[in-house]
Every structure is written in structure tokens, then in C-alpha cells.
Design a protein with these regions (language model features):
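Short beta-strand-turn/beta-hairpin segments enriched in glycine/proline and small hydrophobics
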Residues: 1-5
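Cleft-lining beta-strand/loop regions that shape enzyme active-site pockets
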Residues: 6-7, 15-17, 29-32, 37-203, ...
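Conserved catalytic motifs of ABC-family nucleotide-binding domains
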Residues: 22
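Short, acidic, Ser/Thr-enriched surface-loop or helix-capping motifs
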Residues: 227
Length: 267
């Protein structure tokens, strides 16, 4: 397992420190990390303090000092594409993601969107409860994800509504992980919409990180996520229905498919 940078957001400490897409985080303050959950828990800290990262970039390994700061990043951006297709870029599952996604969807419909492209590329996950709430907007009544625990019964999460009433296309890539894969997996298995892009990251384990008195960190796997059809995500990822490489080409294909679905709706 490794912690790979998807794409540093503009204005964040990661970008300002010089981190690049594809960089691998080996250690945080000397502590070896092999999961994004553990890395994130070690990287977080008070603003204006320093955290040391050991980075592998290609064949090179080097140390990088990052200055922490308070940042506010919108979870969602949205706009119209090619006249009548609404694009919702869901960048993370934070505490505001459901509200922002719902507002974006309503705004795009008001502006005349006849189809939606949901962009989950570079979304590394976040709060699963927000993912499940967002699934209500897109996935009709039925299973979203099953969570398999080591020492307790399997838990199945459902949607209860009617889902989206206009065509949907979903963008994914290798930066789509964890909660993004839960949502994309439900959309794919339930045949709500095609996935366009490249294979997703393959993070299907929900993990907790606990710091001990001596400062060491213990990583505990809490559960494993399975798609509605019982597919394991971890270590495998989701294969897109339409394989396309390159950010711009992926978006163009998604918009093309969305517009085609408007012209030729499936009954």
C-alpha cells in the first residue's frame, strides 16, 4: 500500500510546498504511512506549525517541510457545459458536501440542465455519511453499499427516494477513492449511469488511526465496503464503462454521452 498524491489543490499548503500529482508520501514526521487515513491524521495539526514529509518522486526520495494553515475549500463546483449539460465537480466528502451538491443540482436544473455530469475525479473520499446522503440525490430506492465487519453483522445502507430524473454520467479516475468509489460503485451496479474515465484507486477499507502514549500510531481496519452486487473495491478499484484517458478528453466524452442520453432517453 502507498499514499499517492492525486492533485494538490491551488492555494493549499501541499501546493505551496511543491507537492505534485503522483508523489508518494513515505513518512510523516518520521512515521511510515501506508494508508491515506493514517497519513491525514498525522499531517493535520495547528496552523503555522511544520510537518515533515518524506516524498518519493520517480526514482528520487527527499524531505519536504510543509507549513500547516487553516484552509476552506469548497466541496463542490458547478457550471453549465455545452448549453444544456450541468457539471457538478464533487471534490471531497466534507461536512458540507451534501448541502452543496443539492444546491448545485437545483441551480443547474433551474438554469435548464437536461443532463448531469458528476465529476468524482481526484476525489479521495471523506465522510461516508455525506456520501450516503448524496447517493439519495442520484440513486433510486435500493442498496448503496454493504459494510462487512470482522466481529459484527454486515450492515447494508440503502437509499429511499427516486433518484435523479434526468440522465447522468459519472467521471472517475485513479484519484477517485474510498467514499467516491462507494458512490460510483452504487451508480454503476444499479445501472443508474455509465462511469467514464480510468480505473479508480481501489480503497475499500474503512480505517481508524489511533495515537498511543508513546506517540506511535496504530491503524485499525474497521470495515470493508462492497458494492450493491457484492463486489469488493479494495485493491481492485472500479473499471469504467467507457475507458478514456486525459482530463479534457474524459470530460468531452462524458458531455457527449450526456447529450446523447437526452436525445435518446432509455425508458
Amino acid at each position: 500500500d502507498q499514499v499517492k498524491i492525486a492533485r494538490p489543490m491551488k492555494g493549499t499548503p501541499a501546493e505551496e510546498a511543491g507537492l505534485k500529482e503522483g508523489d508518494v508520501i513515505l513518512r510523516v514526521d518520521g512515521e511510515t504511512v501506508r494508508s491515506s487515513d493514517v497519513a491525514a491524521s498525522l499531517i493535520r495539526g495547528p496552523a503555522d506549525t511544520q510537518v515533515s514529509l518524506t516524498i518519493r518522486r520517480g526514482q528520487d526520495t527527499f524531505e519536504l517541510s510543509v507549513t500547516r494553515k487553516s484552509i476552506s475549500i469548497p466541496a463542490v463546483e458547478h457550471r453549465m457545459e455545452d448549453g444544456d449539460v450541468g457539471l457538478i465537480a464533487l471534490m471531497s466528502f466534507n461536512e458540507h458536501s451534501f448541502q452543496e451538491t443539492s444546491e448545485a443540482l437545483n441551480d443547474l436544473k433551474t438554469r435548464g440542465a437536461k443532463a448531469i455530469v458528476l465529476d468524482l475525479r481526484y476525489n479521495g473520499g471523506g465522510y461516508v455519511d455525506q456520501c450516503l446522503a448524496i447517493a439519495e440525490l442520484f440513486v433510486p430506492k435500493g442498496t448503496v453499499v454493504s459494510q462487512r465487519f470482522k466481529s459484527s453483522p454486515e450492515k447494508v445502507n440503502y437509499t429511499s427516494g427516486e433518484g435523479l430524473d434526468i440522465p447522468l454520467v459519472v467521471l472517475v479516475n485513479g484519484g477517485s477513492a474510498s467514499a467516491s468509489e462507494i458512490l460510483a460503485g452504487a451508480i454503476q451496479d444499479r445501472e443508474v449511469a455509465p462511469l467514464v474515465g480510468t480505473t479508480t484507486f481501489g480503497k475499500g477499507l474503512v480505517q481508524g488511526a489511533y495515537t498511543l502514549d508513546d506517540g506511535s500510531v496504530v491503524k485499525v481496519t474497521v470495515s470493508e465496503s462492497l458494492t450493491p452486487n457484492g463486489r469488493a473495491i479494495n485493491g481492485v478499484g472500479l473499471e469504467p464503462d467507457v475507458f478514456v484517458e486525459g482530463d479534457e478528453a474524459q470530460l468531452a466524452k462524458a458531455v457527449e454521452l450526456a447529450k446523447a442520453a437526452v436525445l435518446n432517453p432509455v425508458s
